[in-house]
């Protein structure tokens, strides 16, 4: 039996909004430690890794490990039926072919319950190696979303250049080019408004904006985002989920000679 209750049900709604446009279906690995999801996107370009630790839920019970194949579009449709203030409970029997979702309005006068059919998914787990990064940039998540959106009007790809004093985002296309530079902030009262850069060596990498704009759908989950970069390894875009986990996206850099791709 698996049962998890989340008083702040809006977190689950935001997680599904952040996943559904990138991944159609995925396996939710449920264990006593929490809920994990790892999946390549539909076109096998990027990788998504979600962790929701059991202690972040208000009550959590998992008698034995489960692997639930979920159609994320379907789950997103059901979660749209939950109000932002609703308490959400997920429930499944040990070898069930459905997942129950129960939404309780905070005033307790309305309870909705839905059953979603699960899928049989054949999933290969990819090992994500631990990695030291040359450059780690932490910045307001809304700012990153805006930069990606603005530069996608200029070109298809963004060059991210990271140096000690700041990080620069550049794009070029038929209409011209655009550059946005953020300097490290020294004294900001609110931590979530700061730009911090930890740099071992400078990095300059190119990424497809189409995917970064998918990743920024996770912006409502966290006031800050962390970008971790090294030459020749995938960029990691990480959104912390309050005190219960994280959502990480991995995207390989574009090789310079891939013109027109």
Swiss-Prot record:
Annotated disulfide bonds: 135-162
Glycyl lysine isopeptide (Lys-Gly) (interchain with G-Cter in ubiquitin) cross-link: located at 164
Its keywords, alphabetically, are: Acetylation, Disulfide bond, DNA damage, DNA repair, DNA replication, DNA-binding, Isopeptide bond, Methylation, Nucleus, Phosphoprotein, Ubl conjugation
Annotated GO biological processes are: base-excision repair, gap-filling; cellular response to UV; cellular response to xenobiotic stimulus; epithelial cell differentiation; leading strand elongation; mismatch repair; mitotic telomere maintenance via semi-conservative replication; negative regulation of transcription by RNA polymerase II
Determine the domain of life of the protein's source. Answer: Eukaryota
Subcellular location per UniProt equals:
Nucleus
Per the record, residues carrying Phosphotyrosine are 211
The protein's matches in SUPFAM superfamilies, at most eight in alphabetical order, are given as: DNA clamp
What are the annotated GO cellular component locations?
centrosome; chromatin; cyclin-dependent protein kinase holoenzyme complex; male germ cell nucleus; nuclear body; nuclear lamina; nuclear replication fork; PCNA complex
Locate the cross-link: Glycyl lysine isopeptide (Lys-Gly) (interchain with G-Cter in SUMO2).
164, 254
Gene3D superfamilies in the cross-refs: 3.70.10.10
Q: Which InterPro entries does UniProt cross-reference here?
A: DNA_clamp_sf, Pr_cel_nuc_antig, Pr_cel_nuc_antig_C, Pr_cel_nuc_antig_CS, Pr_cel_nuc_antig_N
Q: Which residues bind DNA?
A: 61-80
Q: Which PROSITE patterns does the record cross-reference, listed alphabetically?
A: PCNA_1 (PS01251), PCNA_2 (PS00293)
Q: What is its main location?
A: nucleus
Keyword Isomerase in record? no
Record GO terms (molecular function): chromatin binding; damaged DNA binding; dinucleotide insertion or deletion binding; DNA polymerase binding; DNA polymerase processivity factor activity; histone acetyltransferase binding; identical protein binding; MutLalpha complex binding
The family database entries (Pfam families) matched by this protein are listed as: PCNA_C, PCNA_N
Q: Which residues carry this modification: N6-acetyllysine?
A: 14, 77, 80, 248
**PTM (free text):** Phosphorylated. Phosphorylation at Tyr-211 by EGFR stabilizes chromatin-associated PCNA.
Q: How does it associate, per the subunit comment?
A: Homotrimer. Interacts with p300/EP300; the interaction occurs on chromatin in UV-irradiated damaged cells. Interacts with CREBBP (via transactivation domain and C-terminus); the interaction occurs on chromatin in UV-irradiated damaged cells. Directly interacts with POLD1, POLD3 and POLD4 subunits of the DNA polymerase delta complex, POLD3 being the major interacting partner; the interaction with POLD3 is inhibited by CDKN1A/p21(CIP1). Forms a complex with activator 1 heteropentamer in the presence of ATP. Interacts with EXO1, POLH, POLK, DNMT1, ERCC5, FEN1, CDC6 and POLDIP2.
Role: Auxiliary protein of DNA polymerase delta and epsilon, is involved in the control of eukaryotic DNA replication by increasing the polymerase's processibility during elongation of the leading strand. Induces a robust stimulatory effect on the 3'-5' exonuclease and 3'-phosphodiesterase, but not apurinic-apyrimidinic (AP) endonuclease, APEX2 activities. Has to be loaded onto DNA in order to be able to stimulate APEX2.
Query: What family name appears in the similarity comment?
Result: Belongs to the PCNA family.
Q: What is this protein called?
A: Proliferating cell nuclear antigen
* Encoding gene, per UniProt annotation: PCNA
């Amino acid at each position: 039996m698996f049962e998890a209750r989340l008083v702040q049900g809006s977190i689950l709604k935001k997680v599904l909004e952040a996943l559904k446009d990138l991944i159609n279906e995925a396996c939710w690995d449920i264990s006593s430690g929490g809920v994990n999801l790892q999946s390549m996107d539909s076109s096998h370009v990027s990788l998504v890794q979600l962790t929701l630790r059991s202690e972040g839920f208000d009550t959590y019970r998992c008698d034995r490990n489960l692997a639930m194949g979920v159609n994320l579009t379907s789950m997103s449709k059901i979660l749209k039926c939950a109000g932002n203030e609703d308490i959400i409970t997920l429930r499944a029997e040990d070898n069930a072919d459905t997942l129950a979702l129960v939404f309780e309005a905070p005033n307790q006068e309305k309870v909705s319950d839905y059953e979603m059919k699960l899928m049989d998914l054949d999933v290969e787990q990819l090992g994500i190696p631990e990695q030291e990064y040359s450059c780690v940039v932490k910045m307001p998540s809304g700012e990153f979303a805006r930069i990606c959106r603005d530069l996608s009007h200029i070109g298809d790809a963004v060059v991210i250049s990271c140096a000690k004093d700041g990080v620069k985002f550049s794009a070029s296309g038929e209409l011209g080019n655009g550059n946005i530079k953020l300097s490290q902030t020294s004294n900001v009262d609110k931590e979530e408004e700061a730009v911090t850069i930890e740099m071992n060596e400078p990095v300059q990498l190119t990424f497809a904006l189409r995917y970064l704009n998918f990743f920024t759908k996770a912006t409502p989950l966290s006031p800050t985002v962390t970008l971790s970069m090294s030459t020749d390894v995938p960029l990691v875009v990480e959104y912390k989920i309050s005190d219960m986990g994280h959502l990480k996206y991995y995207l390989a850099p574009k090789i310079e000679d891939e013109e027109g791709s």
